[in-house]
Amino acid sequence: MRHRKAGRKFNLTSSHRAALYRNLAAALVEHEIIKTTLPKAKEIRRYVEPLITLSKEDSVAGRRLAFARLRNREAVTKLFNDLGPRFKTRPGGYTRILKCGFRAGDASPMAYVELVDRT
């Protein structure tokens, strides 16, 4: 039974799912807004918010933990040099999900995920 099991599977293997989260998170950090399906948007929020909290305090250990999750040097640099200081006083809730209709091909619900204080 699946009772109290958090997270979505997306019919993917665990390694494919981890790569999906890593790539979406790196894209969100880099571009500060991305368009994806609504379920993926809700999952990526669970993945990115702890990374931003980690980046509020710049340390080598924190950078290594973030790199282990993202595997993208540019994203980690932006996370700690730009996003961490920007969200220093905000106690969570760094992302916003905006629904934006349905995809033409398969009618999947689509959404924008953006960082709240986007420049």
Curated annotation (Swiss-Prot):
Keywords: Ribonucleoprotein, Ribosomal protein
Gene Ontology terms: cellular component: cytosolic large ribosomal subunit
Entry-linked InterPro entries: Ribosomal_bL17, Ribosomal_bL17_CS, Ribosomal_bL17_sf
Pfam family, any one: Ribosomal_L17
PROSITE patterns, sorted: RIBOSOMAL_L17 (PS01167)
Keyword Ribosomal protein listed: yes
Sample GO molecular function, one term: structural constituent of ribosome
Biological-process GO terms, alphabetical: translation
PANTHER family, per the entry: LARGE RIBOSOMAL SUBUNIT PROTEIN BL17M, RIBOSOMAL PROTEIN L17
Subunit structure as annotated in this protein's UniProt entry: Part of the 50S ribosomal subunit. Contacts protein L32.
HAMAP family linked to this entry: Ribosomal_bL17
Stated family: Belongs to the bacterial ribosomal protein bL17 family.
Name of this protein: Large ribosomal subunit protein bL17
Organism ancestry: Bacteria, Pseudomonadati, Pseudomonadota, Gammaproteobacteria, Methylococcales
